[in-house]
């Protein structure tokens, strides 16, 4: 039986007790303390409309080593046409991720309550957005959660070819500079594998998670990065 979380308790079952599909628990709420505790333990929420909150720790897990990102010549060229900003348009990035149509996906897992909850994390300097602009218009980007030296990528969107991949490349460059260890890409996808991400076991991921640099201070990333 999948454990149910109570709203007054912030503890989670151990990820290794997850179901074969990677479900750790269900229920609870999305208050900041619970979300932070979840990410610190390699767990994240992911659920559909009208479903209860479901907490996951998949096995295998997809991660991106910062030095493994594959920056093709064509992407390097595309990157030069965009302007990049950090943490200046967080809610609109989330809303675009919510509304973008995706292949083989009916509807979105990004509910309005998810946007509200992660906006609170953003105000706390824990959730971040990377944004690509073309002629002053937001055309792509991504958002995620920082846990010490780990960045947990949540979702990305693109309205113009290569806009989200370019934002991802800019993110990786800055994570290296800031002393981050790696990116948690969560659920394996061919798109991110093609960019250099790899599947690892849950045990390996949790071991890496517990060794990340926890001296990185949470703060807003309000930077302006003009072209590349």
From Swiss-Prot:
One of its GO terms (biological process) is protein catabolic process. Keywords: Acyltransferase, Cytoplasm, Transferase. Its EC number is 2.3.2.6. GO terms for molecular function: leucyl-tRNA--protein transferase activity. It catalyses: N-terminal L-lysyl-[protein] + L-leucyl-tRNA(Leu) = N-terminal L-leucyl-L-lysyl-[protein] + tRNA(Leu) + H(+); N-terminal L-arginyl-[protein] + L-leucyl-tRNA(Leu) = N-terminal L-leucyl-L-arginyl-[protein] + tRNA(Leu) + H(+); L-phenylalanyl-tRNA(Phe) + an N-terminal L-alpha-aminoacyl-[protein] = an N-terminal L-phenylalanyl-L-alpha-aminoacyl-[protein] + tRNA(Phe). It comes from the Bacteria. It is an enzyme of class 2 (transferase). One of its GO terms (cellular component) is cytoplasm. Its main location: cytoplasm. NCBIfam families: aat. Belongs to the L/F-transferase family. Functions in the N-end rule pathway of protein degradation where it conjugates Leu, Phe and, less efficiently, Met from aminoacyl-tRNAs to the N-termini of proteins containing an N-terminal arginine or lysine. This is Leucyl/phenylalanyl-tRNA--protein transferase. It comes from Sulfurimonas denitrificans (strain ATCC 33889 / DSM 1251) (Thiomicrospira denitrificans (strain ATCC 33889 / DSM 1251)). The lineage of its organism: Bacteria, Pseudomonadati, Campylobacterota, Epsilonproteobacteria, Campylobacterales.
């Amino acid at each position: 039986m999948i454990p149910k979380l109570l709203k007054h308790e912030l503890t989670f079952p151990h990820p290794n007790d997850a179901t074969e599909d990677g479900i750790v628990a269900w229920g609870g709420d999305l208050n900041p303390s619970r979300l932070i505790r979840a990410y610190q333990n390699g767990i994240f929420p992911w659920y559909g409309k009208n479903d209860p909150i479901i907490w996951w720790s998949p096995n295998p897990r997809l991660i991106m080593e910062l030095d493994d990102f594959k920056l093709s010549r064509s992407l390097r060229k595309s990157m030069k046409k965009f302007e990049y900003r950090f943490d200046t348009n967080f809610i609109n990035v989330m809303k675009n991720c919510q509304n973008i149509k995706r292949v083989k996906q009916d509807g979105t897992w990004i509910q309005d309550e998810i946007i509200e909850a992660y906006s609170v994390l953003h105000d706390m300097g824990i959730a971040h957005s990377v944004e690509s602009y073309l002629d002053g218009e937001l055309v792509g980007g991504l958002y995620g959660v920082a846990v010490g030296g780990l960045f947990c990528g949540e979702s990305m969107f693109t309205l113009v070819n290569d806009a989200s991949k370019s934002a991802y490349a800019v993110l990786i460059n800055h994570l290296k500079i800031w002393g981050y260890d790696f990116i948690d890409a969560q659920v394996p996808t061919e798109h991110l594998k093609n960019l250099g991400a790899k599947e690892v076991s849950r045990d390996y991921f949790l071991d890496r998670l517990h060794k990340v640099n926890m001296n990185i201070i949470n703060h807003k990333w309000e930077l302006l990065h003009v072209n590349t």
